């Protein structure tokens, strides 16, 4: 039987992998966005685990709101990424200082 601690450890591992992904690769915007999405997934895992073990559905309902915000964030981030690639022909974070405005 899986306990609450197992799910919390899983969430912590996912969150740590996302943090490592951001710190090890600061150049590629796509990988940074994927790491942020992995962080949100880890938080959602913890919400569902706490919600299940406390017998309350508020955590599970909140997960739907977080997923909605994550989907909007991914769509806006990818739209900015496509515009950046069309403008600069690169997706490196270091080249963002070439933009004017």
Curated annotation (Swiss-Prot):
NDH-1 is composed of 14 different subunits. Subunits NuoA, H, J, K, L, M, N constitute the membrane sector of the complex. Belongs to the complex I subunit 4L family. It is an enzyme of class 7 (translocase). The chain crosses the membrane at residues 4-24, 29-49, 61-81. It comes from the Bacteria. HAMAP family: NDH1_NuoK (MF_01456). Gene3D superfamilies: 1.10.287.3510. Keywords: Cell inner membrane, Cell membrane, Membrane, NAD, Quinone, Translocase, Transmembrane, Transmembrane helix, Transport, Ubiquinone. This is NADH-quinone oxidoreductase subunit K. One of its GO terms (biological process) is ATP synthesis coupled electron transport. NDH-1 shuttles electrons from NADH, via FMN and iron-sulfur (Fe-S) centers, to quinones in the respiratory chain. The immediate electron acceptor for the enzyme in this species is believed to be ubiquinone. Couples the redox reaction to proton translocation (for every two electrons transferred, four hydrogen ions are translocated across the cytoplasmic membrane), and thus conserves the redox energy in a proton gradient. GO terms for molecular function: NADH:ubiquinone reductase (non-electrogenic) activity; quinone binding. Its main location: membrane. InterPro entries: NADH_UbQ_OxRdtase_chain4L/K (IPR001133), NUOK/Mnh_C1-like (IPR039428). One of its GO terms (cellular component) is plasma membrane. It catalyses: a quinone + NADH + 5 H(+)(in) = a quinol + NAD(+) + 4 H(+)(out). It is found in: Cell inner membrane. The keyword NAD applies. Its EC number is 7.1.1.-. It is a multi-pass membrane protein. The keyword Cell inner membrane applies.
């Amino acid at each position: 039987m899986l306990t609450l601690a197992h799910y919390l450890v899983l969430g912590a591992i996912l969150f740590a992998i996302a943090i490592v992904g951001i710190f090890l690769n600061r150049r590629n915007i796509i990988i940074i966005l994927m790491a942020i999405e992995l962080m949100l997934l880890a938080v959602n895992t913890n919400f569902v685990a706490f919600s299940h073990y406390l017998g309350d559905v508020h955590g599970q309902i909140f997960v739907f709101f977080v997923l909605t915000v994550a989907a909007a964030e991914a769509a806006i981030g990818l739209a900015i990424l496509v515009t950046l690639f069309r403008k600069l022909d690169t997706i490196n974070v270091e080249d963002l200082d070439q933009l004017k405005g």
